[in-house]
Amino acid sequence: DSSYYNTGEIVLMKKLPYRIVRNGKGDTRSIVKKTNIMGFTCLEQDCIYTDFPESVQEGDIIEFGNVGGYSIVSKPPFIQPNCKILSITPEGDLVEIKRQETYEDIFQTFNFNL
């Protein structure tokens, strides 16, 4: 789950590099070809990739590259918690550099006892 705000404004300027992790449920009825990849917000500009050229199905994971640090501060702090952030070490290992947020993380700054 992601949105335009997780990838940043670069998605409006160029096609991001991507990798698909095939995890589909094997239901060929759910295969989608040549589609727009939309984010989870209700905003019409929340388009991560226009005319995605490959077939994907429910359960597949699309990993977008070339996404920088501004993407973690641009996302609105509602609708859905931020995803975790991974970094690739020089040795090629994945390291979690920021854990996934929870709804508790989002709401802990609010005072609901008014």
Model-predicted regions and their roles:
Residues 1-114:
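Charged (often Lys/Glu-rich) extended helix/loop segments that serve as interaction or gating elements
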